[in-house]
Regions:
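An active-site-proximal "capping" alpha-helix that borders the catalytic cofactor pocket
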Residues: 26, 118-131
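Pan-zinc metallopeptidase signature
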Residues: 128-186
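Post-HEXXH active-site segment of zinc metalloproteases
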Residues: 91-117
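Auxiliary, metal-adjacent structural segments of Zn-dependent hydrolase domains
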Residues: 1-58
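Second-shell loop/turn segments in exported
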Residues: 6-16, 67-71, 109-115
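Sec-exported extracytoplasmic/periplasmic mature domains
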Residues: 27-32, 85-90, 129-136
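Short pre-active-site segment immediately N-terminal to the catalytic Zn-binding motif
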Residues: 65-81
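Active-site recognition of the HExxH zinc-binding catalytic motif
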Residues: 77-95
Length: 186
């Protein structure tokens, strides 16, 4: 069961229900349910980060999503979903995939991360693109793919293709999904 804790400051301006709905969207993309995962998700503000950014801190089944919404832009629900994807993937699939390594082109800021972390980053970005493309249209998806390539995630079109095919299977995301993806990339 996932336990959600939304900070009072965020509850004031943004309904807790909206957070729950965004979390449910992510679970649906993974073909999971709330009771498939045991973890705690805390969401709070952190004004020490650049405006408009977000990140997640992972500690033994407890995940803290830190947000610094930009006052001039809409609330970053896409960032909330992105960080939630990371939280639940780390909680449910603990494998480091250490026997697998293939070269993944990544931006310099990601080069200190493990293969598993970088593979997961690609997965989260591809799932976000598919989700938001369904919502915002094909052109939006194409622009986002181009943006991700420009950022250094040059294999993102391959990941999007894999996850489009995987979503048709209706299978739950699992360690096997990671392994299938690795073979797909080879």
């Amino acid at each position: 069961m996932i336990r959600y804790k939304i900070s009072p400051a965020l509850q004031k301006n943004h309904k807790s229900r909206q957070f729950y709905l965004v979390f449910q969207e992510a679970l649906k993309m993974l073909n999971w349910k709330d009771n498939d995962i045991r973890c705690t998700i805390n969401v709070r503000l952190d004004f020490g980060m650049p405006a408009g950014s977000g990140r997640v801190i992972h500690r033994r089944g407890k995940h803290t999503i830190l947000l610094h919404p930009s006052p001039r832009k809409p609330f970053p629900w896409n960032t909330v979903r992105h960080e939630f994807f990371h939280s639940v993937l780390k909680s449910k699939i603990r494998s480091r995939l250490s026997k697998y390594t293939i070269p993944l082109p990544i931006p310099k800021s990601y080069q200190t991360q493990t293969f598993r972390e970088n593979l997961e980053e690609y997965c989260v970005r591809a799932l976000q693109i598919i989700f938001l493309q369904q919502k915002n249209g094909v052109q939006w998806g194409q622009k986002q793919v181009a943006h991700e390539i420009q950022q250094g995630f040059t294999l993102i079109p391959v990941f999007v293709k894999f996850f489009r095919q995987w979503r048709k299977t209706k299978r739950s995301f699992s360690r096997k999904t990671f392994v299938d993806l690795i073979y797909f990339l080879n």
